[in-house]
């Protein structure tokens, strides 16, 4: 499989290493901001890389969005987070002519976490819910795309909920329809997501802790391996 990388930061550098270990070839890179040197051919536009079978994106909206407006038919694996609603709209339009895979978190374990959450929320309707994520001190967006995804799952299963991002200005008790959303940044934390269900005299916590960023890179490579055999459409872990 020949791979074009969109972005050449820490994540796609891992993708390159792990993909080559699996026998795949990196045939080019699109990156206008990275200070890292690359041994691969560099391109400005997706359509310029004729050898690629698929593109894997770990970048940012500033780099990705203009590329999505171009004319090409290359399958895309998208891991960019931020500006989610706009991103999804663009990807759904693009998926009418080419296969597109998107996940806010490329870990299959996080996908399993969302499935567990779908089961837990209806069972624990009387419990308050708080969501917490923790990442390294270089992550610039907050809350994480994964935490937003977890909130979206809850919103579909519990009526009239609303997110609460900051409590220090509130001088009133918590309401049941609040979903607390908290972000922690520090050190080299790869990624941690905790769902707290707090009831009367008991709590339940569901957690996922990433121990290496390799899980995200391997998830993207695995998605690409399947996506290149798919018809045009919008794919997630649910239908890939």
Curated annotation (Swiss-Prot):
Can you cite an annotated GO cellular component? Answer: cytosol
State the reactions this protein catalyses. (S)-2,3,4,5-tetrahydrodipicolinate + NAD(+) + H2O = (2S,4S)-4-hydroxy-2,3,4,5-tetrahydrodipicolinate + NADH + H(+); (S)-2,3,4,5-tetrahydrodipicolinate + NADP(+) + H2O = (2S,4S)-4-hydroxy-2,3,4,5-tetrahydrodipicolinate + NADPH + H(+)
Q: Which residues hold (S)-2,3,4,5-tetrahydrodipicolinate? A: 136, 145-146
Name of the protein: 4-hydroxy-tetrahydrodipicolinate reductase
Which pathway does this polypeptide act in?
A: Amino-acid biosynthesis; L-lysine biosynthesis via DAP pathway; (S)-tetrahydrodipicolinate from L-aspartate: step 4/4
| Keyword NAD listed | yes
Localization? Cytoplasm
Which species? Staphylococcus epidermidis (strain ATCC 12228 / FDA PCI 1200)
The record's section on PROSITE patterns has: DAPB
């Amino acid at each position: 499989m020949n791979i074009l990388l969109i972005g050449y930061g820490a994540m796609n550098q891992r993708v390159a290493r792990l993909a080559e270990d699996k026998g795949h070839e990196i045939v080019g890179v699109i990156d206008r901001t990275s200070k890292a040197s690359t041994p691969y051919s560099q391109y400005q536009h997706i359509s310029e890389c004729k050898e690629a079978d698929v593109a894997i994106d770990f970048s940012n909206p500033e780099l990705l969005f203009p590329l999505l407006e171009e004319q090409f038919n290359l399958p895309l694996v998208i891991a960019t987070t931020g500006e989610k609603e706009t991103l999804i709209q663009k990807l759904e339009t693009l998926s009418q002519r080419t296969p597109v895979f998107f996940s806010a978190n490329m870990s299959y374990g996080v996908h399993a976490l969302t499935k567990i959450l779908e089961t837990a929320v209806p069972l624990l309707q009387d419990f308050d819910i708080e969501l917490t994520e923790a990442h390294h001190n270089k992550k610039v967006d907050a809350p994480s795309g994964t935490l937003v995804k977890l909130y979206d799952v809850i919103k579909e299963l519990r009526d009239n909920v609303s997110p609460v991002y900051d409590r220090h200005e509130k001088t009133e008790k918590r309401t049941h329809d609040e979903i607390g959303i908290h972000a922690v940044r520090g050190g080299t934390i790869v990624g941690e997501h905790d769902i707290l269900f707090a009831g009367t005299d008991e709590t339940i916590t569901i957690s996922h802790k990433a121990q290496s960023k390799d899980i995200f890179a391997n998830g993207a490579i695995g998605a690409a391996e399947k996506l290149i055999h798919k018809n045009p459409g919008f794919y997630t872990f649910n239908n890939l």
